[in-house]
Structure formats: structure tokens, C-alpha cells
Amino acid sequence: MIAEVRPGHALALRSRPFGRVLARVGSRTPFGSQRALGVVATRHGRWLAVTDAAVGNNRLVWVDAKSGALRYTRTPLELVVDLSARTLTVQRNGSTVRHLSIGVGRAGSPTPTGTFAVTDKLNGGAYSAAYGCCILSLSATQPNLPVGWTGGNRIAIHGTLSASDFGRAVSAGCVHASNSDLRYLMRTVPLGTPVVIRR
């Protein structure tokens, strides 16, 4: 399930159901996209566990489904990134739809593992030719930024200037994919789609 924050609303991200507020988020991401949260679990029919970059990796936060700030959609899709195999698999209802060869984070700035969600779909050219055609930003962050890195701490699936990146550990933590695969993902994958990154 995907929970979208309604325009004009704010949403409290809590440490647990009825717990303390860790952050408040609006209906737009820092990149200007509609905020769509991938729902990982539910509790007591009222509380939804979600991931958000505002609280860091591998930390679920809880949102009140009865707050009136959310609307819901569903997607049968899931992206599975296998860091060892250096592949990204698009799954629909558990069946493989497409298998991509990717580049991943190098030693010292590895791609973080865990369950995340697609938060933004952006034009790569608006940022740098190094990002290729397209950027799918994730709710994951990079805690091990390389010295001198100025590109922010968000993890994304994006392009590269070098086709030799695919099948290798070469990035500052992001997942590198070909422009043709990125265009497919941009067309196919809705905001809030779950992304599982594993070793």
C-alpha cells in the first residue's frame, strides 16, 4: 500500500503508535514531488509503519491512518536490489518482470541495505549529465559520504557517464542504471513503490 499526504496537510512521523513525534512532513518532498510513503506494516487497524528519509535508514516510523492527512493507492510492484549480484529486479506480485544490470556503492561508501521507497522521479539533466536521463530518489540516505562529496546524502537510482559501471561497485552509494532501464522505471514505477536493498 502507498500512503500519499494530501495537499495542504502535514503528517506527524512517530516513534511508535501514539509515540513521540520525530518529524513532521508536508505533502511535498524536498524535491517538490507529491509525498508518497511506502507502507511496510499496520498495527491496530489505525497505525501505518512507513519509511522516510527524514528519520534515516532502517528505521520505521508510524503515522496515524485516521488523521485525515492521507489518501491511499496500491501497487503490485516492488524493486529488489541485490548488491552481491549487482542486479535490480522489478517484481509484480512476486514475479520477475524485468532484470537490470546495475552499478552499486564502492567500498567506503556502500549502498545501504534495508526497505525503502521511491520518493521522487526527477529529470537527471536538470541536475547534472552525470545522473543520466532520470533519477528515482529513494527514502534511503548515505551515512558514509565520500570526502569532498557535495551532492547531498540521498540515495537514488540514476544514470552514469560510463557504461562500464554496470556490474561493478563504483558509486558513492547510489544505484547506477542505463538510460533505457531508467526510462522504463520512470514510466512504470509509481511514487511510494517499495525498494528492498539486500547484500
Regions found by a protein language model. Name each.
Residues 1, 51-81, 98:
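Boundary regions of SH3-family modules and the immediately adjacent low-complexity/disordered segments
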Residues 1-38:
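Beta-loop motif signature
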Residues 6-10, 34, 45-47, 58, ...:
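Extracytoplasmic
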Residues 24, 99-101:
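Residue-level detector of high-confidence beta-strand sites
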Residues 27-67:
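SH3/SH3-like beta-barrel superfamily modules
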Residues 54-55, 67-77, 106-117, 122-199:
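Exported/periplasmic cell-wall-interacting domains
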Residues 88:
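Gly/Thr-rich phosphate-binding beta-strand-loop-beta motif of the actin/hexokinase/Hsp70
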Residues 91-95:
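Short acidic-glycine loop/turn motifs at beta-strand connectors
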